[in-house]
Amino acid sequence: FTRRYGMYHLPILSFKEYVELKLNKSFESQRLENILENHVDIANDIIKNLENEKILKNFEEYIKIGAYPFYFENKDNYTQMVLDTINTILYSDLGSIYNISGDKINSLRKLLTSICVSNPLELSIESLAQKVGTSKVTLYKYIELLHKAELLRHVVYEGKRFKSMQKPDKLYLANTTLLSSLCLEPQIGTLRESFFASQLSVKNSIYYVDKGDFLKKKK
């Protein structure tokens, strides 16, 4: 008897999906290019569809609690459920799959906390390695593991695709719900960048650039 299983990657809820689930409404999906060219008309249509609901209020809610659909099953204990999920990923999933000891798992958690309280471009690998208490080589391995586990988002400078550039990498928590759950007072700018990166990275590779915030390339 052969056991068969299928694997499917399910991204976090987008802001659109969160609002649709919460309000039981349907909104047309939009390509980024169309949003950039026709954002006024699109915004007016959305506002009409929302009727008396305030879009900014719903956006503020999404930033805090919108990434994972189990929010709608248990709203009162949602933050604790997110923290429990993080611990499950760290101690059960990563610990078992990669045979990581408990002290190293604690270093992974310390890495998440360090990213949480820092501005993305203020982080250097050297200083981060010191905070976590590990070598640069090991730190890069930790970053890769957390990126694969979708707890962390690793964004490199666009120029690094072509040549060696002395530019620091940007590290974010993977989505704004993680940021809001792990950080007491997340910075507004970091929340906005984390939101944008989490929405676009589902179907795009993203880089940071000198002019503007991000460059996207189709995967």
Q: Where is each model-derived feature located?
A:
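Accessory nucleic acid-recognition modules appended to NTPase machines
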Residues: F72-K218
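Interdomain motor-coupling "hinge/lid" segment immediately C-terminal to the ATP-binding subdomain
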Residues: F1-N106, C116
